[in-house]
Amino acid sequence: MSIAAVIQMTSAPDVQQNMHTAFTLLQQAAQRGAKLAALPENFLLMGMTEQDKFSIAEDQGQGPIQAWLAQTARQLNLWIVAGTVPLKVPNESRLAAACMVVNAQGEVVTRYDQTHLFDVD
């Protein structure tokens, strides 16, 4: 039987603090036998404005957030479903809210970009 963990956490405006909290919870899940753990949407940052997300957005396959996810997955031998990670969209002025699945070898094996069909003011 395989064990999956669903992580619940309250994200703060500090990305480093949120990554530390997420690591602690992922580590606990792995120690309890989980082989896969899902982090919540906005686990990295609960910003006050859209600009907050732009300030931490990364290019696909590059940046400290994605490096942290890969390293954490390898270190804990854990598949991670990474809630949402703000990624830059080439040639566009918007971000992708990317749900990334990282295997225990630290490789992104799939990604889903959340899209909104309308904007609300």
Descriptions of predicted regions:
Residues 15, 24-105, 109-111, 119-120:
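Cys-nucleophile CN-hydrolase/nitrilase-fold catalytic domain and related Cys-dependent amidase chemistry
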Residues 7-8, 51:
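A short, mixed-charge helix-start or loop-turn motif at secondary-structure junctions
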Residues 8-15:
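Short polar catalytic/cofactor-binding loops
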Residues 1-5:
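Extreme N-terminal starter segment of soluble prokaryotic enzymes
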